[in-house]
């Protein structure tokens, strides 16, 4: 049976508050915390994904202001999360279909067991000071995100490792000895969490001056006016908004639901684009079986839309 979710029209919903959060901390009781946290989120109409592990918490949630406030108050009331910080943005419609609290080995998967961001990380740089750092010719700027994210936006002059997953980043560093040619390393990611591990890893590898953007791209776009910005493009986000721009306004990108790659308006006009079936990035690798399966899913989504529902596979 196909799962459906009845959802009010976006114009009836108003704006939703989106909270992105993470916190590295020793958290041995993470498994037993899953049920109570799920219950608090469900009771307050909050949706999204939160990851729990021995090393802390990570995720993004959305809901009404009151709902988000209640969940955040519950989290910060826990002794492990008293220092929890979060970043806020807005969405015209609920950007998540359901609430998931998941147990993981790591809250962001790098696969290097010898580093601990609770012990060693790089130096935080506030958004207002970031431009001066990355404009310094003595600084090498590195984007720690994956290739589908960097494809739609980068800081000017940044090195793009073009990794498929964050697990590939350590090998990329080990294989690029030229990274030692400049005395300063400046690193950034979407919200800051990947840089916690990336800078810890760089320090372990012998890099001394390692910096990272506090609050990530999201905090920079929130605080730095477009006319002063060194950011080019949009920032990929892991919800139905797909991308955000300066002021955290929703971007113009959509998502290919076949390969999960972000699409520009120009990509959508390509003859290779068939909604939910293929796009400029994946059309060459789709079999006819794949296409027919995706077309059936699109038919189910269209039927759900006619009934005023949202298909959970959309």
Curated annotation (Swiss-Prot):
Active-site residues (renumbered): 189
Record keywords: Oxidoreductase, tRNA processing
Domain of life: Bacteria
Leader sequence segment: none
Catalytic activity: uridine(34) in tRNA + AH2 + O2 = 5-hydroxyuridine(34) in tRNA + A + H2O
Pfam families: Rhodanese, UPF0176_N
Disulfide pattern: none
GO biological process, one term: tRNA modification
Ranges for domain Rhodanese: 135-229
SUPFAM superfamilies named among the record's database cross-references: Rhodanese/Cell cycle control phosphatase (SSF52821)
InterPro entries in the cross-refs: Rhodanese-like_dom, Rhodanese-like_dom_sf, TrhO, TRHO_N
Main enzyme class: oxidoreductase
The keyword Zinc-finger is assigned to this record: no
Single Gene Ontology MF annotation: oxidoreductase activity, acting on paired donors, with incorporation or reduction of molecular oxygen
Gene3D superfamilies, per database record: 3.30.70.100, Rhodanese-like domain (3.40.250.10)
PANTHER family tied to this protein: RHODANESE-LIKE DOMAIN-CONTAINING PROTEIN 7-RELATED, THIOSULFATE SULFURTRANSFERASE/RHODANESE-LIKE DOMAIN-CONTAINING PROTEIN 2
UniProt function note: Catalyzes oxygen-dependent 5-hydroxyuridine (ho5U) modification at position 34 in tRNAs.
Assigned protein family: Belongs to the TrhO family.
Protein name: tRNA uridine(34) hydroxylase
Source organism of this protein record: Sinorhizobium fredii (strain NBRC 101917 / NGR234)
